[in-house]
Swiss-Prot record:
Domain Glutamine amidotransferase type-2 residue range list: 2-218
Protein's GO biological process: carbohydrate metabolic process; fructose 6-phosphate metabolic process; protein N-linked glycosylation; UDP-N-acetylglucosamine metabolic process
Superkingdom per UniProt: Bacteria
The protein's role, per its UniProt record: Catalyzes the first step in hexosamine metabolism, converting fructose-6P into glucosamine-6P using glutamine as a nitrogen source.
Subunit structure and binding partners: Homodimer.
Protein name: Glutamine--fructose-6-phosphate aminotransferase [isomerizing]
Keyword tags: Aminotransferase, Cytoplasm, Glutamine amidotransferase, Repeat, Transferase
Localization, UniProt: Cytoplasm
Gene name of the encoded protein: glmS
Length: 607
């Protein structure tokens, strides 16, 4: 991981295209960057550890005319972040250059074999092993050579390869790692992310697992896993990169926080009819909900916390066993799956490898699979039995905000749809739940207008090193997402707990200077939360309350983020928006790179 781009064109501007494309995928996170391009004297590789700017400055030393090349931003999985471990990688003879997203599981045994044959390696990566193997097995034909290589390796990968014997050609393939082809006029592209090439084309081919593609400036030839030449559908991407630009905001994150009212309204308008009934008939075709006796919601990170909200909605409204699991653990927890199981997989990018592998496992066990994703044509949406798209639009900041809200809202609507199908929700309650969505939108707008109050709180807590986020019931799910936002862009250790669990050990860590964020949107449990606040205040904690109007929390805390009532199930979503602001402004005050936090990637495509 993380970003791939390739170019073959009639103009000698490959380096410019590659650097521009890598800039567009910086948001995915990386620790080094590099490019390889074909010149009259062969293949030239230039790469640098650190920010892309380092590579750009380095390239100012060269005057390069090249029509074909590949580029990569790397996130270290094998070998520390250095120039030598950055992609692309040569073969020893420098006839091959290769970039790779993924992990080669058996690289150690192949490397040992190549070392015994006298091959000299110049990096510590699993990727270089593939470049060296390709060179060793090369038979004068790119396609047959790559097929021999793929028979030797195990793992997940998206490869892009150039060879000195074919100066105008790239050969690429994918297996459980995203790769697309962009079609232009006398120029064609490959990329891991459509953002990288939107400046040049909106005509996209989404490759499937097992596909191998040969790309020149005028031709794209795709072979499937059975080695048959196939025609993949060309899809037109509707959004352009300008939609993903900052639009006058200081950072993508705050822009995306403040796009949430629009997304709430769009989701309501698209997924309900004029009578305000949820219309998922097309998306959920073929599912008989009367046959479903168990539901799993599986995801990673923020999507998992959105899934916890979805679990709460479904258990409350449907009376069905609903379980959530972290995707990286799902396969190893021996989930009970039958043909009466509905397994829901949530992924913003649709390319999260742990989630994809979990879905594959569930399908093999006989579950009906439903994907909730933000990216049209992504792997998860192609492989699931059914798909509901979130309508968040491109999310660039690594810290997810609007994607979370849209995931929660889709699961809320899904719960209402299922409840109506099963006769579990009375009509008056159903209409109240639907009207709460419009109320949520109005109240997010109001919260946005009051954001400077949250900024003031952030100024007071910016130097705090440790914190706890507490809540009860659905608010405990809010606590988890709030805690994650704070830690991922502020590098503050925070822990989310059910408020009642604090006294079972963790209260030993409460002392002066510790931050506690106490969440209370359910007035039935408000007094218990107030009691927990008093416990931590007595031990010196600085307490920020996050609650709805009518709560007693403001009377006992140091600062408060107070939101308006948006209904029993959606007020917690509004509270999360407040906690997104708190994390954002704290990071701003600390002077950190809000959109690109250290050690994080937007889309995690390795296990």
């Amino acid at each position: 991981m993380c970003g791939i781009i390739g170019y073959s064109g009639s103009k000698a501007n490959a380096v410019e295209v590659l650097l521009e494309g890598l800039e567009k995928v910086e948001y995915r996170g990386y620790d080094s960057a590099g490019i390889a391009f074909v010149t009259d004297s062969g293949i030239q590789i230039e790469k640098k550890e650190g920010k892309l700017e380092n590579l750009k400055n380095h390239m100012k030393n060269f005057e390069v005319l090249s029509c074909t090349g590949i580029g990569h931003t790397r996130w270290a999985t094998h070998g520390i972040p250095t120039d030598r471990n950055a992609h692309p990688h040569y073969s020893e003879s420098k006839d091959v250059a290769l970039i790779h997203n993924g992990i080669i599981e058996n690289y150690v045994e192949i490397k040992k074999e190549l070392l015994e044959q006298g091959v000299k390696f110049s990096s510590d990566t699993d990727t270089e092993v593939v470049a060296q193997l390709f060179s060793k097995l090369y038979d004068g034909d790119l396609y047959s050579t790559l097929k021999k290589v793929l028979k030797r390796i195990r793992g997940t990968y998206a490869f892009a390869i150039i060879h000195k014997d074919f100066p105008d050609k790239m050969i690429c393939c994918r297996n459980h790692s995203p790769l697309i082809v962009g079609l232009g006029e006398h120029q064609n592209f490959i990329a891991s992310d459509v953002s990288a090439i939107l400046k040049y084309t909106r005509d996209i081919i989404y490759l499937e697992d097992g596909d191998v593609v040969l790309v020149t400036k005028d031709n794209v030839t795709v072979y499937d896993k059975d080695e048959k030449e196939v025609k993949r559908e060309v899809k037109k991407v509707e959004w352009n990169f300008e939609q993903a630009s900052k639009g006058g905001y200081a950072h993508f994150m705050i822009k995306e926080i403040e796009e949430q009212p629009e997304i709430i309204e769009k989701t309501l308008n698209v997924y309900t009819d004029k009578e305000k009934n949820v219309k998922f008939d097309e998306q959920l075709e073929g599912i008989n909900f009367h046959d479903i006796d168990r539901i799993y919601i599986v995801a990673c990170g923020t999507a998992y916390y959105a899934g916890l909200q979805g679990q709460y909605f479904m258990k409350k409204l449907l009376g069905i066993d609903v379980f959530t699991d972290i995707a990286s653990e799902f396969r190893y927890n021996d989930p009970v799956i039958t043909n009466k199981t509905l397994a829901i997989f949530v992924s913003q990018s649709g390319e999260t490898i742990d989630t994809l592998m979990s879905m594959k496992y569930a399908k093999e066990k006989g579950a009906r699979t439903l994907a909730i994703s933000n990216v049209l044509g992504s792997t998860i949406t192609r492989e699931a039995d059914n798909v509901i798209y979130t309508l968040a639009g491109p999310e660039i900041s690594v810290a997810s905000t609007k994607a979370y809200s849209s995931q929660v809202l889709v699961m809320y609507l899904l719960s209402l749809y299922m409840g109506a199908k099963l006769g579990k929700i009375e009509e008056k309650d159903y209409q109240k739940y639907i009207s709460d969505i419009s109320l949520l939108k109005e109240n997010v707008v109001k919260l946005i207008s009051e954001k400077e109050k949250i900024h003031d709180i952030a100024k007071k807590i910016k130097d705090i090193k440790n914190g706890f986020y507490l809540g009860r019931g659905i608010d405990e799910k809010v606590a988890r997402e709030g805690s994650l936002k704070m830690k991922e862009i502020n590098y503050i250790h925070t822990e989310a707990l059910p408020a009642g669990e604090l006294k079972h050990g963790s209260i030993a860590l409460i002392e002066k200077g510790v931050l506690v964020v106490a969440i209370s949107t359910n007035l039935e449990m408000d007094e218990k939360v107030v009691s927990n606040i008093k416990e931590v205040k007595a031990r010196g904690a600085y307490v920020v309350g996050a609650c709805k109007e009518g709560s007693l929390v403001p009377e006992v805390v140091d600062d408060v983020i107070q939101v308006k009532d948006s209904g029993e199930l959606l007020t917690p979503v509004l509270t999360v928006v407040g906690l997104q602001y708190l994390a954002y402004y704290t990071s701003l005050e600390k002077g950190y790179d809000v959109d690109k936090p250290r050690n994080l990637a937007k889309s995690v495509t390795v296990e």
